[in-house]
Amino acid sequence: MVRASYLQIYNENISDLLKTERSSLQIREDKKRGVFVEGLSEWAVRTPHEIYSLMQRGAMVRATAATKMNDVSSRSHAVFIMIVEQMTMQDQSQTDPSKQIKVGKLNLVDLAGSERVRVTGATGKRLEECKKIN
């Protein structure tokens, strides 16, 4: 089974790029799940095309803006997460075989553009974004 999620960190707020509502999500940690983003949607995917479609969908709503250096500059950090699970059966000869689940997680990270304010001439909203990017 493969699941995918896509989030952005913009102005110190985490949001789900695959949901229509833009609520601020929280990072949590527990013994079973480790570090996770509470409320982040997970989408079951079966093909590379489905993965690419989710990436495109999230990229369309990601925070971007024009600067003097780039026509389209990402203003948020983004993380595309893929979780792969594999279930195997242990010793099939037993009447009650135990199951083993292997989990792999891949985080694809795209960091926000951090152009120098002096070079880009950022003011107003762009200047406030620059302060929070790093």
Identify the residue ranges that each predicted region occupies.
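P-loop NTPase "switch/coupling" elements that transmit nucleotide state to mechanical/effector output
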Residues: 1-134
